[in-house]
Swiss-Prot record:
Record Pfam families: Thymidylate_kin
Keyword entries, A-Z: ATP-binding, Kinase, Nucleotide biosynthesis, Nucleotide-binding, Transferase
InterPro entries: P-loop_NTPase, Thymidylate_kin-like_dom, Thymidylate_kin_CS, Thymidylate_kinase
Gene name linked to the record: tmk
GO MF annotations in UniProt: ATP binding; dTMP kinase activity
HAMAP family from the UniProt entry: Thymidylate_kinase
EC assignment: 2.7.4.9
Binding-site list for ATP: G10, I11, D12, G13, C14, G15, K16, T17
Highest taxon of the lineage: Bacteria
Entry protein name: Thymidylate kinase
Any single Gene Ontology cellular-component annotation: cytosol
């Protein structure tokens, strides 16, 4: 039996990293992970060694290095292919749990709804890249674009974060559509950290307690 693959999605500033850190402390003691298995936390882009190099290319804020929308899509896809091959699939086949900060639906939201690349093209690329490796459960931490920008006002933005509120609005609407279509667990990220964390934990217990 394979391990579990959990993904946390949302626009920048929604608290994905914070919640993954909370889960990394709770899950090993929760009783959900089988004895002998472990928890692996990862992210996209940059979850593998090659991915870290690709992340630098993708998020470089130097305007002279800005890739075309199609090149950007393929860079993310290359990162994901390596991520699945080197990190995600080996862990799941070892009965480990994997929690990822973003996965393939971020590409649909950002490159599809944000960049307006044809969604069917993205889905075809992703079907080749993912090779049937999809999350068992996805959480969508939902905040408004305005709150996202406010939370990040003291940070140095990367290239994607520098796109502005109109781009972020399109991405956020994309996430909402995907969340409804795929029946994600949607959680308001405007709540305090503990409340969000408790809702995530409760959902995991409800979904996977019988798999222990």
């Amino acid at each position: 039996m394979k391990g579990k693959f959990i993904v946390i999605e949302g626009i920048d500033g929604c608290g994905k990293t914070t919640q993954i850190n909370e889960l990394s402390k709770w899950l090993p003691k929760s009783g959900l992970i089988k004895k002998g298995s472990k928890l692996i936390t990862t992210r996209e882009p940059g979850g593998s060694l090659l991915g870290k190099k690709l992340r630098g290319l993708i998020l470089d804020n130097n305007k002279t290095n800005k890739p075309s929308s199609l090149a950007e899509l393929l860079l993310y896809s290359a990162d994901r292919a390596e991520h699945i091959s080197k990190i995600i699939s080996p862990a799941l086949n070892n009965n480990d749990w994997v929690i990822s900060d973003r996965f393939s639906d971020s590409t649909l939201a950002y490159q599809g709804y944000g960049r307006k690349i044809n969604l069917e093209i993205i889905k075809k690329v992703e079907s080749i890249v993912c090779q049937g490796e999809y999350p068992d459960l996805t959480f969508f931490l939902e905040i408004s674009p305005e709150e996202s920008i406010m939370r990040r006002k003291n940070e140095i933005p990367d290239r994607i974060e520098s796109e502005g509120i109109r781009f972020l609005e399109k991405v956020n609407e994309g996430f909402k559509l995907i969340a409804r279509e795929k029946k994600w667990k949607v959680i308001s990220a405007s709540q305090n950290i503990k409340t969000i964390s408790n809702q995530i934990k409760e959902t995991l217990l409800n979904n996977f307690s019988n798999d222990k």
